[in-house]
């Protein structure tokens, strides 16, 4: 579980996050939503340790990231998997070598076991047969699946996804959503997804937090959205559902 307590973050005397409190459970897909400039990306960066809040706690199963030294943070990052808005694959490496990269960097396993793990992860995302291809030779959706395989290579406890469906068509987005959801349950990971894709929210949003102008405006489940009386949330959902329909 990841817990956020009384989180504040400012830039140049402008408060970007104000008194954010939230908890994200294991084995569930937790979604952070909000318009551009709402603070959701800053919140994600504070959670993973890329930014340091002025005040508050970020607890990883009771361990406060804010108070950790460099060595502790390095150890914690080995427990994290990350999927970026762009797949962020190495173009000069094959699909297989991309998945092997974190294993070669951080795993103490012998080479045979690292290879076995990489192939297991590729097979899990149905890309075993594409292992010798380069990123430029496969589709955008396949690249995202490679990114998922790489993210789970070290068997992380925590998975962070930044706009994982960006640039994908609705059908491919559904495949990626289902894959992230299923893997989250299989590994009992704490998964946090930063998105404004309402199809994702309504499809896999087991917990949803809506950020508005740096404040936590609303939280609930995907089903709670349909009965929400929060006008700001309702306007956001209407806007981005309409955008998805137009696409």
Model-inferred region functions:
Residues 48:
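Helix-to-loop junction immediately C-terminal to a conserved catalytic motif
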Residues 56-64:
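Conserved ABC transporter NBD signature motif
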Residues 153-157:
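A short, proline-enriched helix->beta-strand linker immediately N-terminal to the Walker B motif
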Residues 134-138, 142:
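Conserved ABC ATPase signature
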Residues 240-245:
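Conserved small/polar residues in nucleotide/adenosyl-binding loops
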Residues 159-162:
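Catalytic Walker B motif of ABC-type/P-loop ATPase nucleotide-binding domains
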Residues 170-172:
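Helix N-cap at the start of a conserved alpha-helix in ABC-type nucleotide-binding domains
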């Amino acid at each position: 579980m990841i817990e956020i307590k009384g989180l504040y973050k400012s830039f140049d005397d402008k408060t970007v996050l104000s008194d954010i409190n939230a908890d994200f459970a294991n084995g569930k897909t937790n979604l952070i939503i909000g318009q551009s400039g709402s603070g959701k990306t800053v919140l994600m960066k504070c959670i993973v340790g890329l930014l340091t809040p002025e005040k508050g706690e970020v607890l990883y199963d009771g361990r406060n990231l804010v108070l950790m030294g460099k060595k502790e943070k390095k150890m914690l990052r080995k427990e994290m998997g990350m999927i970026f808005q762009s797949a962020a694959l190495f173009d000069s490496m094959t699909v297989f070598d991309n998945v092997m990269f974190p294993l070669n960097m951080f795993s103490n396993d012998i080479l045979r076991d690292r290879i076995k793990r990489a192939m297991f992860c590729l097979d899990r995302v149905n890309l075993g047969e594409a292992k010798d291809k380069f990123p430029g030779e496969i589709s955008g959706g396949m690249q995202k699946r490679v990114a998922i395989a790489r993210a789970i290579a070290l068997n992380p406890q925590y998975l962070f996804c930044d706009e994982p469906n960006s640039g994908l068509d609705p059908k491919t987005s559904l495949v990626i959503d289902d894959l992230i959801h299923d893997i989250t349950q299989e590994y009992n990971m704490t998964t946090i997804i930063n998105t404004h894709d309402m199809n994702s929210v309504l499809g896999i949003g087991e917990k949803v937090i809506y950020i508005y102008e740096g404040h936590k405006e609303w939280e609930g489940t995907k089903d709670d959205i349909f009965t929400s009386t929060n006008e700001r949330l309702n306007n956001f959902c209407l806007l981005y559902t309409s955008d998805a329909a137009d696409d």
